[in-house]
Amino acid sequence: MFLVNLLILIIPVLLAVAFLTLLERKILGYMQFRKGPNIVGAHGLLQPIADAVKLFTKEPLRPLTSSIYMFILAPILALSLALTIWIPLPMPLPLIDLNLGLLFVLSVSGLSVYSILWSGWASNSKYALTGALRAVAQTISYEVTLAIILLSIMLINGSFTLTTLNLTQEYMWLIVPTWPLMLMWFISTLAETNRAPFDLTEGESELVSGFNVEYAAGPFAMFFLAEYANIIIMNALTVILFFGTYHLIFLPEMSTTTFMIKTMLLTSLFLWIRASYPRFRYDQLMHLLWKNFLPITLVTCLWYIMLPTTLSGLPPQM
């Protein structure tokens, strides 16, 4: 039965990822005054299926000098981790209700660094290795801010369980008292998922395509799916943390629908940002985190530690 539930979770995620690529191309198209994909199917709706067929029917080429096992394992690991993070998410009920759900999400997202590092190192290409090292440095750096923001939210929530956040936000979304944290969290998720304007790992002008430059066909598609699955998961997590997942007084049955609408709106904002802003310089990227975000998040975390004691209030309990 658990396997059936797992499949019911994974298949819609993969479908959502496939159609997110179409949504991105459509949004970028309309923002650049063109139509985007409109040939395959009505209004280009079958384009993701055509792309998948094309990629998975091509021959997966491998450089002769590459490390074969790591080269093959890296995309499999990337996609597996991207799908694993969905397990503790309450939508409105999680697949497994973990006591330390947020810690699990943070740990698994941290492991995705290894897939990037392996792919860059195993490709035996200077462009891939440079892109991988950039990606690893960027991901590890921004995870520091994400962890401190999560700790601040957990101090308000009183538990590491994700389902408790629904009770915490029953009367007011957490974005209202913690909007500076939300802004820093959103920018950090952009950097964590290597999206524009933080897509330095895939700088076409300098690194050809970044850490996945030597990949083609199926393995490339797996990296692609992992990247877009991470975008959706980060936005779903943003909704759970700051926008109250399923509390809808008049229509409690519409909980999953409202959750997905909020996630889709935030994901569209990711794509809008890609179309609007140029790429950061690498030193600016690191300066933003270590000299701006880190001190602010540490101060706010200390503030939330002192707040319950100062006001003699207790965090909500299950």
UniProtKB/Swiss-Prot annotation:
Keyword list, A-Z: Electron transport, Membrane, Mitochondrion, Mitochondrion inner membrane, NAD, Respiratory chain, Translocase, Transmembrane, Transmembrane helix, Transport, Ubiquinone
Membrane topology: Multi-pass membrane protein
EC number of this enzyme: 7.1.1.2
Keyword presence, Transport: yes
Listed PROSITE patterns: COMPLEX1_ND1_1, COMPLEX1_ND1_2
Localization per Swiss-Prot or TrEMBL: Mitochondrion inner membrane
GO cellular component terms, semicolon-separated: mitochondrial inner membrane; respiratory chain complex I
Family that this chain belongs to: Belongs to the complex I subunit 1 family.
Name the record gives this protein: NADH-ubiquinone oxidoreductase chain 1
Source species of the chain: Ornithorhynchus anatinus
Gene name for this UniProt entry: MT-ND1
